[in-house]
Amino acid sequence: MIKRLKTLIVLVFVLLPFGLLSQTATLKGIVFDGEGNSVSGATVAYANQGVVTDRNGVYVLEIPAEKKVTVTFSFLSLKTVSFALTLAANEDYEFNPVMQADIEVFGELVLDVKKRKRIEGIQSFSPEMARKMVGGNSGVEAVLMSLPGVSGNNELSTQYAVRGGNYDENLVYVNEIEVYRPFLIRSGQQEGLSFVNSQMTANVDFSAGGFQAKYGDKLSSVLDITYRRPTDFEASVDLSLLGGQLTVGDKSEDGRFTALGSVRYRDNSLFVNAKETETNFRPRFTDLQSYLTYKVSNKLELGFLGTASINDYRYEPLTRQTNFGTIQDPRALLVFYEGQEVDQYRTVFGALKATYVISDNYTTKWMASAYQTAEQEHYDILAQYRLGEVNTSIGDENLGEVEFSEGIGSQLTHARNDLEALIVNINHRGQIQSGVHQVEYGLKYTNERIRDRVSEYEIIDSAGFSIRPPLVDFQNNQPYEAFDSPIVPFNASSGENDVVISRISGFAQWSYRDEWNNGELYLNAGVRAHNWQVDDGVNASVTQTVFSPRAQMSFKPFGSKDQLFRLSVGVYHQPPFYRELRNRQSEVVPQVKAQQSIHLVLGHDYSFNLWERPFTLNSEVFYKHLTDVNPYTLENVRLRYAALNNAVAYAYGLDMRLAGEFVPGTESWVSFGYLKTEENIDDRGFIFRPTDQRLKFGVLFQDYVPVMPDLKMYLNMVYNTGLPGGSPSYADPYDFQTRLPDYKRADLGISYDLVHDNKPGKGLLSSFKDFAVGVEIFNIFDVQNSITNTFVRDVYTKVQYAIPNYLTPRIFNLKLSAGF
């Protein structure tokens, strides 16, 4: 079976299908008159094709993709509106024109969405791809991790690192509102659902660095999500062995009010129960999201984004056997567990947004949001282990069992960690357009209140002896001198904190776009300012301020070749969030400074036709110089900071992505990334940073059977070289510069569309707009990837063995999707 799958994947890349499907995109929206009323019976047309708006003014028009199309809106006694646009294959774009009173007046608005994003250094992809692409955590993040410069070595986690940064250095916006992730997550299997709901998504934009001043104060990347507005009643259901989702949307008869809501449920048992640790595992990840809009008038619109999530995680490990070593010297670790872990995460998020169009050239926005979370991490787990040789005698009834134990011991881990946080934001933004010039500005106030209790320890016993912490200055001269020190845990951390952080930040930026020197020139310059005050209730409050100037320049020469050259340079600061203020002893250090990074990014985009189909080659070379670096350790997905600005670092590399229609009518890409990042802590010399992932290859591929186009395939393959790590958490990184094994994974999804727009349902399926069934194969080659090591000592030789903690093996999943 596996051999056939390998052959299939090779054939996919060598023998591309010869069938040709039409390339289309969808333009939709609502037509309004000057009074804000929807226009029924208006004609929406391009070339010789067209549709008429329904009684609510709604239209849906399919147009050719990857080419400039002029669309005209016309209605008796109203001005004719005409505009040109270029959309990608399968892209959905919403446009709501306003037709003023008059007759036969022709105005033109040139709109090239992809081109505008390209000159700003933004990568965009269809949300439909995020909905259909296969992955351990399918959705937007699964697609991101196939991009160059983006790495993630845990299929159960939605967290990602970009160009040498860590998980805390990425901005995520939904409808221009910043969203947050949980604080106490230690492993991917605890995470559950991502905030971003791919079924509600209309646009996905991503920048891997060198982004503009209008985005916030983080060092690495920006993910900008826009939720969609339904144009008619809709409902969809997605079911699988991993959970399910129900999404419902509708609008009012006059088109002023729209509502979109979704309920999601996820159960990771399919993944966790397939791992080598036998468990009683009962996770329950549930969330509810809603997006509401109301058009008060032609100038004022209100929006609401809300979410509530309840995550319950109950984990009771029973036994584990991990085989390692070589063929000549096979070894195994056998562990028996007692105890359990019970975690709870309760999150509520709400945001209000008002958009007011003062004039055709001036738009303002007011936003207010609140994020509240209550998190609990409680566990008491006793692990008793045996380390020894494995019985390899074929035919023996004890084949594969551990015998001749070389290490016997136990480990007790305990935690009572609780956290409550309330984050409130008030934000104002404005945009002024004057000819080829555009000015944007913003001002934001944030108040963060975090209450945290940490109480955790680890006790290790080996052959009846309690192992003391690995302290450098510890001395034990037994039996010559009596040792009367108390027994202490091998590792411990405790503390209680109540911290209030107040922030005021703002930005102003100017953009210019016009023809210059036989080409098109785009300039952008801006600056951010950020002032914050930390009050921990114990020490005197600390106030700091940073300024971050940034600039971009893009040039697109006229001519037969579609090329774009781009330069970005700027200073990026990351003022400390709560996690970065807390050291490894769980103490808050208010004096921690903002980390600073100077970015230089050179980019080149080249669009061309291959096999008479469109392709684009994106290339970027980047360099980062970082100062006031706050060192951290990475264990699984848990970050622990030193809360010291005692390091400097650098990162440089190359990102390349070839995207296009490898198969007619579908978008796929192949990506390559090279990265080197090192840090110098306390002038001890440069060493690898925890996210120094040297090479990255990614393939995201869509295919179909030419004679049966409803049978489709989705392939997601990633290869990452190993991260520095795998050493004990207490180890000095200057003493342990080892790397984990390379991360290799391929996920395959196959689906069949029983009902769609061009294939109406019959019989029991007649009430569905679309209906599809499929199967997913995760980790199709059954590669054993590891993200951490468990260290066990041999009592006889005093040698410590690094036992890999493997991630998920090959898993099969069934999937069903239906739309009404």
Residue ranges and their predicted role:
Residues 79, 86-89, 115-211, 222, ...:
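Periplasmic N-terminal accessory/gating domains of Gram-negative outer-membrane beta-barrel systems
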Residues 421-423, 444, 493-624:
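Structural signature of Gram-negative outer-membrane beta-barrels, strongest in the C-terminal barrel
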